From Swiss-Prot:
Source organism per UniProt: Methanothermobacter thermautotrophicus (strain ATCC 29096 / DSM 1053 / JCM 10044 / NBRC 100330 / Delta H)
Presence of keyword Nucleotidyltransferase: yes
Gene Ontology CC entries for this record: cytoplasm; DNA-directed RNA polymerase complex
MF terms in GO: DNA binding; DNA-directed RNA polymerase activity
GO biological process, one term: tRNA transcription by RNA polymerase III
Pfam families: RNA_pol_Rpb5_C
Gene that encodes the chain: rpo5
Protein name: DNA-directed RNA polymerase subunit Rpo5
């Protein structure tokens, strides 16, 4: 049941960044992790992908105008 949520058409793709990817993204955004929007460890998608506190998650949404919209979230309790 965990993985079924990831296949739903309204749930965008979520990817946990590794440490080097997270550092690169934070540098590009000129931001600290705490400045990112948050996602809870209890969020159903965070649970399904195995996100832990402190992880940065890349969310890729389909957009009719931009084709893709990418955002990042910091996982917190």
């Amino acid at each position: 049941m965990k993985r079924e949520i990831l296949k739903h058409q309204l749930v965008p793709e979520h990817v946990i960044l590794n440490e080097s990817e997270a550092k690169r993204v934070l540098k590009e955004l000129d931001a600290h992790p705490e400045q990112l929007p948050k996602i809870k460890t209890t969020d159903p998608v965070a649970k399904a992908i195995g996100a832990k506190r402190g992880d940065i998650v890349k969310i890729i949404r389909k957009s009719p105008t931009a084709e893709e919209f990418v955002t990042y979230r910091l996982v917190q309790d």
